[in-house]
Amino acid sequence: MKMPAKTGKEYMERLKQAKSSVYIHGEKVEDVTVHPAFRNVVRSMAALYDRQYEKPEKMLYRSPTTGQPVGMTFIQPTTIDELIARREATQEWARMSAGMMGRSPDYLNAEVMAMGIANDLFAEDDPMFAENAKNYYEYAREHDISLTHTLIHPQMNRAKALHEQNDADVPLHLVERRKDGIIVSGIRLLATQGGITDEILVFPSTVKKATSGEDPYALAFAIPNNTPGVKFICREAFDYGRSAWDHPLASRFEEGDAIVSFENVFVPWERVFVCGNSSICNRTFRETNAVVHMSHQVVAKNIVKTEFLLGVTLCLIEAIGIGEFQHVKDKGAEIMLVLETMKSHLYRAEHNAKRDRWGTMTPDFAALDAARNWYPRIYPRLAEIIRILGASGLMAIPTEADFQHEEIGDIVRRAMQGATVDGYERVQLFRLAWDLTMSAFGARQTHYEYYFFGDPVRMGMAYFDGYEKEPYKQFVREFLRGAKSVFIPADNKH
């Protein structure tokens, strides 16, 4: 009997059969599972789904509706133990990519769960929309749907609202309401893994708030990637077809990012969650607690990523014998401090978790919000530390082919030897550090983490505005009043 949780083979077969409209390097892709730009990351994604059956006790749970095994990352946690179990499944997947896959399936699985359970916000417009969110969660869970999403509009004139643009039809907008659904047209950014998933979620920004004048652009829906009129226009691939030795990360985990074009796309009503209501869009992520559960996944993933960065740093230090230098230890300590701080945020978030009014065990958002605001600001420094410590060794890095060449192989092996490793091992390590921080893939990782939840400055403003400030101001006022009451004036005679 077929199980709802899919295998890697089933994931790839779905992509083959879907034949979504995917474009890259000026050509239309016939089959993403074999195209050089996608085939390796598709196999990395397939490995994630295979892991569900390799470790079913960690990666699967019984569906509350069918009793069959479904993905643990879809679970609605109702206890702290279940919350931790979901996080452990997230980190199991994260370790398979060293945290490099920012849009592994668990990220959007958490969003779909939260909005499907806390669906009454969508009913403010029409009870149908709440029912749609609930049904979509069950559908995604029971069919193990892989998802990409798009939250932002094209960068046109950021000084103007969407409806004030010179070409106001470029951003994705509502064209027509029909008895059976809606017609939408326009462009959205930035669909990571666009074209290599089953479906796409179109949702409002998590940070930028819309005005009532932007109601035609206020949409939330989910449709298959192969819906007529949908095109994924992918950026240049950073997987250049090189070996996993030369490009150990890019050759396996290059997710890709895409512009998504909607050309008079029909969306049936049962797939619509918000239609022309900027007020609901502005409140969607916070009032459903979706941002809390998504942040829980992100912090868990970033802990794994930081563990990997620390491991690379320590191996690099050991390889070239720089471990006794004062500044080297200090830089290593910086990464250790980031790791332990992130772990502390996660522990507090999980152990202070409380059930929300829908019965979902919800992590302490104060801890997660601090972590998700801080990590984008500190990640560039972590990458910088590796670059500083690697120094010229990250520039003079031969390829594996150089070691195999009969004339120069021995020269390279001798020239590249380290304190504790031979030349071959040292270059392999340094190529990893380079791909992590300096290659096109590595530079994209730094940029991606910096803007993960949106503009860090805009996020910081929102964090400041939402922070409970009064207790701290009152603390100071009471201190000053107390100081005044016990103050004894100096005796002028002395």
From Swiss-Prot:
<dbReference type="InterPro" id="IPR004925">
    <property type="entry name" value="HpaB/PvcC/4-BUDH"/>
</dbReference>
<dbReference type="InterPro" id="IPR009100">
    <property type="entry name" value="AcylCoA_DH/oxidase_NM_dom_sf"/>
</dbReference>
<dbReference type="InterPro" id="IPR012687">
    <property type="entry name" value="HpaB_Deino-type"/>
</dbReference>
<keyword id="KW-0285">Flavoprotein</keyword>
<feature type="binding site">
    <location>
        <begin position="149"/>
        <end position="151"/>
    </location>
    <ligand>
        <name>FAD</name>
    </ligand>
</feature>
<comment type="pathway">
    <text>Aromatic compound metabolism; 4-hydroxyphenylacetate degradation; pyruvate and succinate semialdehyde from 4-hydroxyphenylacetate: step 1/7.</text>
</comment>
<feature type="binding site">
    <location>
        <position position="192"/>
    </location>
    <ligand>
        <name>FAD</name>
    </ligand>
</feature>
<keyword id="KW-0274">FAD</keyword>
<keyword id="KW-0503">Monooxygenase</keyword>
<feature type="binding site">
    <location>
        <position position="149"/>
    </location>
    <ligand>
        <name>substrate</name>
    </ligand>
</feature>
<comment type="subunit">
    <text>4-HPA 3-monooxygenase consists of a reductase component HpaI and an oxygenase component HpaH.</text>
</comment>
<dbReference type="GO" id="GO:0016627">
    <property type="term" value="F:oxidoreductase activity, acting on the CH-CH group of donors"/>
</dbReference>
<dbReference type="InterPro" id="IPR046373">
    <property type="entry name" value="Acyl-CoA_Oxase/DH_mid-dom_sf"/>
</dbReference>
<protein>
    <recommendedName>
        <fullName>4-hydroxyphenylacetate 3-monooxygenase oxygenase component</fullName>
        <ecNumber>1.14.14.9</ecNumber>
    </recommendedName>
</protein>
<keyword id="KW-0560">Oxidoreductase</keyword>
<feature type="binding site">
    <location>
        <begin position="155"/>
        <end position="158"/>
    </location>
    <ligand>
        <name>FAD</name>
    </ligand>
</feature>
<feature type="binding site">
    <location>
        <begin position="455"/>
        <end position="458"/>
    </location>
    <ligand>
        <name>FAD</name>
    </ligand>
</feature>
<feature type="binding site">
    <location>
        <begin position="103"/>
        <end position="107"/>
    </location>
    <ligand>
        <name>substrate</name>
    </ligand>
</feature>
<dbReference type="GO" id="GO:0050660">
    <property type="term" value="F:flavin adenine dinucleotide binding"/>
</dbReference>
<keyword id="KW-0058">Aromatic hydrocarbons catabolism</keyword>
<comment type="function">
    <text>Utilizes FADH(2) supplied by HpaI, to catalyze the hydroxylation of 4-hydroxyphenylacetic acid, leading to the production of 3,4-dihydroxyphenylacetic acid (DHPA).</text>
</comment>
<dbReference type="GO" id="GO:0052881">
    <property type="term" value="F:4-hydroxyphenylacetate 3-monooxygenase activity"/>
</dbReference>
<dbReference type="Pfam" id="PF11794">
    <property type="entry name" value="HpaB_N"/>
</dbReference>
<dbReference type="InterPro" id="IPR036250">
    <property type="entry name" value="AcylCo_DH-like_C"/>
</dbReference>
<dbReference type="GO" id="GO:0010124">
    <property type="term" value="P:phenylacetate catabolic process"/>
</dbReference>
<dbReference type="InterPro" id="IPR024674">
    <property type="entry name" value="HpaB/PvcC/4-BUDH_N"/>
</dbReference>
<feature type="binding site">
    <location>
        <begin position="205"/>
        <end position="206"/>
    </location>
    <ligand>
        <name>substrate</name>
    </ligand>
</feature>
<dbReference type="Pfam" id="PF03241">
    <property type="entry name" value="HpaB"/>
</dbReference>
<comment type="similarity">
    <text>Belongs to the FADH(2)-utilizing monooxygenase family.</text>
</comment>
<dbReference type="InterPro" id="IPR024719">
    <property type="entry name" value="HpaB/PvcC/4-BUDH_C"/>
</dbReference>
